[in-house]
Regions:
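Rossmann-like dinucleotide/flavin-binding elements
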Residues: 1, 8, 15-24, 28-54, ...
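A short beta-to-alpha transition loop/helix N-cap that caps and shapes the active-site region
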Residues: 58-62, 70, 216-220
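Short, hinge-like loop/turn segments at secondary-structure boundaries
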Residues: 66-71, 165, 225-228
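Glycine-rich active-site loop/strand segments that organize a redox cofactor
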Residues: 62-98
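Short gly/ser/thr-rich secondary-structure transition/capping motifs
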Residues: 6-13, 165-172, 251-256, 291-297
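A Rossmann-like FAD-binding core segment of flavoenzymes
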Residues: 106-108, 112-136, 140-143, 202-293
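Short, well-ordered coil/turn residues at beta-beta hairpins
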Residues: 149-150, 156, 172, 187, ...
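Flavin (primarily FAD) binding-site architecture
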Residues: 148-164, 275-287
């Protein structure tokens, strides 16, 4: 079990010796739906709670494709027992953004957006958290407990190939218009890749899908599967299965297929190959990660990590198996943690 000395401290002495600007019972790192749910549950117990995020409120949802429709129904995205009403059976990205804004206002949650947590020092009951804002100003917070709910959408899974760092390569898809009349390669075969390929094709791009799998996965949204399959069948969207990208050039993409190597004319690439949690940040706090799947060591009942007083919540609990936890089940982590907070902070 890590001691105070085992948790790294990189604060300059003058900064570390200064008086924290805020004293808290609970600091939540990450303002996604799960982080908000954790803050609500802790605040409902009467604790002084603050949420910090290096981006905006529900930053991952904001970065979803502009016209994205959720696979789930609205009630499965609800937090804080606040109803989520939508115009149709499936909620849209815009509806979700509005809902989480309203929930934040309803509970008057203290959210510090665009605050990047740099260091966590101290011990259970007396942690020191240092963050920087957009202007580079340093903020110090002292808190009794910490909940880490940083998600995974910030860090794409890189392919490690030549040309991946070219400005024509993107790991997120927002909207199709800029790629009209362009040759576009979409790498991946899951929902994000299939939907991006369809959106691009509908808006006049010449699209080729490259996927390492033998066929499209069964997890595709039920309304997306027949659409993408028909576009491929009719040769409206090109597709290479059991194939990988070897190199990205200024005006081409080279792929390896089961039969040969193919060089495709190309203007833009969307490498939608998945994302992963910020393992380095978790390790910097002292949280141990499993060797194979990078799952954080934690009590499955309370979600307290191997660092006493530091809890993990949301998709980071699953490590690299990010498909195991969604908003639908991660939103309940706040209640699990709250039970332990009540026992330890009020007991």
């Amino acid at each position: 079990m890590p001691t105070q000395e085992m948790i790294p401290s990189t604060l300059p002495r003058t900064q570390a010796d200064s008086r924290p600007e805020t004293w808290l019972d609970v600091l939540v790192i990450g303002a996604g739906p799960t982080g908000l749910a954790c803050a609500i549950e802790a605040q409902n117990l009467g604790f002084k709670v603050m949420v910090v995020d290096k981006g905006c409120l529900v930053n991952s949802i904001y970065n979803y494709p502009a016209n994205m429709v959720f696979f789930t129904t609205p009630e499965l995205l609800e937090i804080g027992d606040i109803p989520f009403t939508t115009a149709h059976q499936k909620p849209t990205r815009l509806e979700a953004l509005e809902y989480y804004r309203k929930v934040t206002e309803r509970f008057q949650l203290h959210i510090c957006q665009y605050h990047w947590v740099k260091t966590v020092t101290g011990e259970d009951g007396n942690f020191r958290v240092t963050a920087t804002d957009r202007g580079g100003r340093i903020h110090d917070y002292q808190t009794r407990k910490i909940i880490v709910s940083t998600g995974y959408y910030d860090l794409p899974n890189l392919m490690g190939i030549p040309g991946e760092d070219l400005p024509k390569v993107f790991h997120y898809f927002r909207e199709p218009h800029p790629y009209y009349d362009c040759d576009v390669v979409v790498i991946g075969g899951k929902n994000s890749a299939a939907e991006a390929a369809l959106e691009l094709w509908r808006h006049g791009a010449r699209v080729t899908l490259v996927y390492r799998g033998a066929q499209l996965p069964s997890s595709l949204k039920y309304w997306v599967r027949p659409d993408i399959e028909n576009r491929i069948k009719n040769f409206e969207i090109g597709a290479y299965f059991k194939s990988t990208v070897q190199e990205v050039g200024l005006d081409y993409v080279q792929i390896k297929t089961p039969e040969s190597t193919v060089k495709l004319k190309n203007d833009f690439v969307f490498a939608l190959t998945g994302y992963h949690p910020d393992y380095d940040f978790l390790r910097s706090i002292g949280i141990e990660l499993s060797a194979e799947q990078c799952r954080p060591a934690c009590d499955p009942e309370t979600l307290e990590s191997n660092v006493p007083g530091v809890y993990v919540a949301g998709v980071i609990v699953a490590g690299s198996r990010t498909s195991e936890i969604f908003i639908e089940n991660g939103r309940f982590h706040g209640k699990q943690i709250a039970v332990d907070l009540r026992a330890k902070l009020k007991g």
